[in-house]
């Protein structure tokens, strides 16, 4: 059989964005091609061996709720699991997993190779076929022309990638992989705003040369958490500990005395690095008053001695890297397996994208991941899933979809990017979401799985499990509501004694659960029955205890919904709207917001300007009605 020359969707790149994009498109029944420069690196964790964390796990759970692969692969490859912020409220709790790189990558590849409607082909993409402002396909490195209705670019750090170690640099997409030069040049010819960003990675250490006895052990949680809504702890490989050590005055002295050899501080690197994952050079420069910084020693896997020293990312020369590492307690005799480095790469201003992640100037061309200025596997995976979904919807002739800010962290991520743009690598935090009590990691499936089913992203097995869970939550809430406890009875006295809360009158169990001192597990232990599914029990408890706050947020969302959903015509001429300042006209003209809500979040666009836009829309609507009736 000849290799197909036409697909409905082509995805370029096999990293975290590309794999989720290709899988999403194929799950929707669309003929999809995943082009990668190397099949062996599909799903590769290029930087730290971890998935999740504050804000990030919310994205992973949302990807999972929509049928994506990241959470399931984490459960199969995770060698340590912890819940961060476990003593805080449910809105900011976050699951984080250390992952075995080999196992994680194998899980992703297995998923890809067993996905119907998905073809995988090892070829670099050198060019796009664009006709009349519409993408028509791609041209590969060996000159193959492959056509498609939509193309999703998930190029990571490969576009014009330049690797720096000290004052030396060379072209590369990441260590050991070639960059994408021809495609980068082609994209720069398009009417899109382009910039340069930078990221980095620390040297890798041979664990046999490390003294763990002087470090602080950091074991995983017990019982072991799971990442996927369909996951279970039986899927997990053997679990291991991480370790904590610290930099010291000697470490900082070594770095400070060698800043003139840093490509970042000597002006060689032009790209801006990630604010929330700075290099060790950046840390000692920005936080000069700090005497030490934590270094988390993270195992890379079960079948390797390599360690990832999280916290000392650097692009200093190798001889300086060795001095830095060996100045840290427990690593005095450490052997470096791979040097750390920084990498500069092209990214494109995400304000040139629609909510669907389709470019505004080239129809059918979608961007996802680091090409949009983000950093992190989770942010990339979320964008990939959304871009792949919308590429498939376009091929099917259906309307595009993007969750709102009050529906998902994916919605927050995309809205931030296309409205505000970014001058530095963008990372997700719970603090970026104004409705975070509703957007918890534990209820991502309740928020999104039904929509995923409607879109064609969710298979029968996941849908059946979700429906069972949702029904169980409703049944347990009804049971608690209809079960009463009276003062003076054995159960009433037991509750009063256990919780130190005497009952003054008859209560149903749901009322009792609203009290801060009463938890679900203890209440059920006294009253009997109850739910054995921990996911169901968690939902019942959180929904009950925070019902007042949740209702308040829902009311606020309902009030804002009208303006949020009001569409702004694509052909609107902001310069013709009387009363708008030149500055606001310019900002609206550059961003071209899709809705009134998006316009209101553009920096410098005032409430008065939004009122003028509303008046203009009403006049425009009235004028069109008169034309139609004439």
Curated annotation (Swiss-Prot):
GO cellular component terms, A-Z: cytosol
Domain of life: Bacteria
Subcellular locations according to the entry: Cytoplasm
Principal place of residence: cytoplasm
Any one GO molecular-function label of the UniProt entry: flavin adenine dinucleotide binding
Protein's GO biological process: tRNA methylation; tRNA wobble uridine modification
Keywords noted in UniProt: Cytoplasm, FAD, Flavoprotein, NAD, tRNA processing
Disulfide bonds: none
Signal peptide: none
Pfam families: GIDA (PF01134), GIDA_C_1st (PF21680), SAM_GIDA_C (PF13932)
Requisite cofactors: FAD
Binding sites annotated in the UniProt record for NAD(+): 273-287
Positions that bind FAD: 13-18
Matching InterPro entries: FAD/NAD-bd_sf, GIDA_C_N, MnmG, MnmG-rel, MnmG-rel_CS, MnmG_C, MnmG_C_subdom, MnmG_C_subdom_sf
Cited Gene3D superfamilies: FAD/NAD(P)-binding domain (3.50.50.60), GidA associated domain, C-terminal subdomain (1.10.150.570), tRNA uridine 5-carboxymethylaminomethyl modification enzyme MnmG/GidA (1.10.10.1800)
Stated family: Belongs to the MnmG family.
PANTHER family per UniProt: GLUCOSE INHIBITED DIVISION PROTEIN A, PROTEIN MTO1 HOMOLOG, MITOCHONDRIAL
Function in brief: NAD-binding protein involved in the addition of a carboxymethylaminomethyl (cmnm) group at the wobble position (U34) of certain tRNAs, forming tRNA-cmnm(5)s(2)U34.
Subunit structure: Homodimer. Heterotetramer of two MnmE and two MnmG subunits.
Protein name in UniProt: tRNA uridine 5-carboxymethylaminomethyl modification enzyme MnmG
Organism listed in the record: Pseudomonas savastanoi pv. phaseolicola (strain 1448A / Race 6) (Pseudomonas syringae pv. phaseolicola (strain 1448A / Race 6))
Gene name as annotated: mnmG
């Amino acid at each position: 059989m000849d290799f197909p020359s036409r697909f409905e969707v082509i995805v370029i790149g096999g990293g975290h964005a590309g794999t989720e994009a290709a899988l999403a498109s194929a799950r929707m029944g669309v003929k999809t091609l995943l082009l990668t420069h190397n099949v062996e690196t599909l799903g590769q964790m290029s930087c730290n061996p971890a998935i999740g964390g504050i804000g990030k796990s919310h994205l992973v759970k949302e990807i999972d709720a929509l049928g994506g692969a990241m959470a399931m692969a984490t459960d199969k490859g995770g060698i340590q699991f912890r819940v961060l912020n476990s003593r805080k409220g449910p809105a900011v709790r976050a699951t984080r997993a250390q992952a075995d790189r080999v196992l994680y990558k194998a899980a992703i590849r297995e998923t890809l190779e067993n996905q119907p409607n998905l073809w995988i082909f090892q070829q670099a993409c050198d060019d796009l076929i664009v006709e009349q402002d519409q993408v028509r396909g791609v041209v590969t490195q060996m000159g193959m022309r492959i056509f498609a209705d939509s193309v999703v670019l998930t190029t990571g750090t490969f576009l014009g990638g330049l690797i720096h170690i000290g004052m030396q640099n060379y072209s590369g997409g990441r260590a050991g992989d070639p960059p994408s030069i021809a495609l980068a040049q082609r994209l720069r010819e398009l009417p899109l705003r382009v910039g340069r960003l930078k990221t980095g990675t620390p040297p890798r250490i041979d664990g046999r040369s490390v003294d763990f006895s002087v470090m602080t052990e950091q074991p995983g949680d017990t019982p072991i958490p799971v990442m996927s809504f369909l996951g279970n702890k039986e899927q997990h490989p053997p679990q291991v500990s991480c370790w904590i050590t610290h930099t010291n005055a000697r470490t900082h002295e070594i770095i400070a005395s060698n800043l003139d050899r840093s490509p970042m501080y000597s002006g060689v690197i032009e790209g801006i690095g990630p604010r929330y994952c700075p290099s060790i050079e950046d840390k000692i420069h920005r936080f000069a008053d700090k005497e030490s910084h934590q270094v988390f020693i993270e195992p890379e896997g079960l079948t390797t001695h390599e360690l990832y020293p999280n916290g000392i990312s650097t692009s200093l020369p190798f001889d300086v890297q060795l001095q830095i590492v060996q100045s840290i307690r427990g690593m005095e005799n450490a052997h470096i397996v791979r040097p750390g480095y920084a990498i500069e790469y092209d990214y494109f201003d995400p304000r040139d994208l629609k909510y669907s992640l389709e470019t505004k100037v080239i129809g059918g061309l979608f961007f996802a991941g680091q090409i949009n200025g983000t950093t992190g596997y989770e942010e990339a995976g979320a964008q990939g899933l959304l871009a792949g979904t919308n590429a498939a919807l376009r091929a099917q002739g259906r309307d595009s979809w993007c969750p709102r800010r009050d529906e998902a962290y994916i919605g927050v991520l995309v809205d931030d990017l296309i409205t505000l743009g970014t001058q530095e690598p963008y990372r997700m935090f719970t603090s970026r979401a104004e409705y975070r009590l509703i957007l918890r990691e534990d209820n991502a499936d309740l928020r999104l799985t039904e929509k995923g089913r409607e879109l064609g992203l969710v298979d029968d097995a996941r849908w059946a499990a979700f429906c069972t869970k949702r029904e169980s939550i409703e049944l347990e809430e009804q049971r608690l509501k209809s079960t009463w406890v009276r003062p003076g009875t054995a159960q009433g006295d037991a509750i009063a004694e256990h919780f130190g809360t005497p009952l003054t009158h008859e209560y149903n169990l749901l009322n009792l659960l609203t009290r801060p001192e009463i938890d679900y597990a203890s209440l059920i232990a006294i009253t009997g029955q109850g739910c054995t599914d921990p996911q169901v029990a968690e939902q019942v408890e959180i929904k009950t205890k925070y019902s007042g706050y949740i209702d308040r947020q829902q009311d606020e969302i309902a009030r804002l919904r009208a303006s949020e959903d009001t569409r702004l015509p694509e052909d609107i001429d902001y310069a013709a709207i009387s009363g708008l300042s030149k500055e606001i006209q310019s900002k609206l003209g550059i961003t071209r917001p899709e809705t009134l809500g998006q316009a209101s979040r553009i920096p410098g666009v005032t409430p008065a300007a939004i009122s003028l836009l509303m008046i203009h829309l009403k006049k425009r609507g009235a004028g069109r009605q008169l034309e139609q009736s004439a």
